[in-house]
């Protein structure tokens, strides 16, 4: 694994590779912190579950201060990715 910028589908693919059967997770920001208040009011069928792909816009909005900052904006290590595994 080479430390590099991982964004969008490349980031999700890397998480699947690193986490394998354990799956992965993220911690969304509180609804008041979201740019679009409608995002926090998604249908229960759209609520993210560990290791499931989400619509990219929702995923990027909810993760803006976490894994995206660590791995897309900055360069990410294998160990940083493992922090998001279940």
Swiss-Prot record:
Propeptide: 33-63
Gene Ontology BP terms: cellular response to oxygen-containing compound; glucose homeostasis; glucose metabolic process; positive regulation of protein secretion
Coiled-coil region: none
Gene3D superfamilies, A to Z: Insulin-like
Alphabetic keyword roster: Carbohydrate metabolism, Disulfide bond, Glucose metabolism, Hormone, Secreted
Annotated GO MF terms: hormone activity
Quaternary organization: Heterodimer of a B chain and an A chain linked by two disulfide bonds.
Family: Belongs to the insulin family.
Protein name: Insulin
Organism: Chinchilla chinchilla
Lineage, uppermost ranks: Eukaryota, Metazoa, Chordata, Craniata, Vertebrata
Primary gene name: INS
